[in-house]
Amino acid sequence: MRIGILGGTFDPIHYGHIRPAMEVKASLKLDKILLMPNHIPPHKNTTHSTTEQRLEMVAQVCTSLPGFELCDIEAKRDSPSYTVVTLKQLSRLYPDDELFFIMGMDSFIQLQSWHKWQQLFEFANLVVCQRPGWHLAAESRMQHELSARHASIDALSISSHPQHGHIFTVDISPQNISSTQIRSQLAMGEIPRDTLLPVTLNYIQKQRLYFS
């Protein structure tokens, strides 16, 4: 089984998270996507909703979307959400499956600042989402890593057993949506129907989340 993993604060989860994940799932023919809210993001100091509320929003999204599942192992951890620790744990939970950790190009460029980043490749493949026609600058620190580990999507159909350590790039449609933007709209009394799944908007309104 090929399993995609998309982590994030998801405060709240929105189409800017979901649509790229769906495109990656289709492009790489993944069997499912794990949506994984983190508990204590290493690069963020606070959230605007509780861990329980974010878990519930993601759980409801997964109920609405076939092939999506909630993964709560980071949310239940009382320590920073270091990706290498999470992937090691997931590789033990799914020993016979192939893991694909999904990230944006902006995160990939900063990958060398991540905790034990080189060990990520011991447990999973990386999927780097990029806008069509966009390429990593030749002088980028991560260009060598990308060149050395880059694999074509066609190679997936050739492999008969799980692999890790590769980097796949997937062109995705631009998504000019952010959680900050959505929270600001809600605080001003605007209803961002075009950016949230109906089930998420309904939950936010019932819980009075993000309203000032």
UniProtKB/Swiss-Prot annotation:
Keyword check for Protein transport, yes or no.
no
The pathway entry for this protein reads as: Cofactor biosynthesis; NAD(+) biosynthesis; deamido-NAD(+) from nicotinate D-ribonucleotide: step 1/1
Reactions mediated catalytically: nicotinate beta-D-ribonucleotide + ATP + H(+) = deamido-NAD(+) + diphosphate
Which chain regions cross the lipid bilayer? none
Q: Which residues form the signal peptide?
A: none
Q: Which Pfam families match?
A: CTP_transf_like
InterPro entries assigned to the protein according to its UniProt record, in alphabetical order: Cyt_trans-like (IPR004821), NadD/NMNAT (IPR005248), Rossmann-like_a/b/a_fold (IPR014729)
What the entry lists under CDD domains is as follows: NMNAT
A single Gene Ontology MF term assigned here is:
ATP binding
Keywords (alphabetical) are: ATP-binding, NAD, Nucleotide-binding, Nucleotidyltransferase, Pyridine nucleotide biosynthesis, Transferase
- List GO BP terms, alphabetically: NAD biosynthetic process
Provide the E.C. number(s) assigned to this enzyme: 2.7.7.18
Q: Does the keyword Acetylation apply?
A: no
What this chain does, per the record?
A: Catalyzes the reversible adenylation of nicotinate mononucleotide (NaMN) to nicotinic acid adenine dinucleotide (NaAD).
Q: Which family does it belong to?
A: Belongs to the NadD family.
- NCBIfam families, per the entry: cyt_tran_rel (TIGR00125), nicotinate (nicotinamide) nucleotide adenylyltransferase (TIGR00482), PRK00071.1-1 (NF000839), PRK00071.1-3 (NF000840)
Record-given protein name:
Probable nicotinate-nucleotide adenylyltransferase
Organism from which the protein derives: Shewanella oneidensis (strain ATCC 700550 / JCM 31522 / CIP 106686 / LMG 19005 / NCIMB 14063 / MR-1)
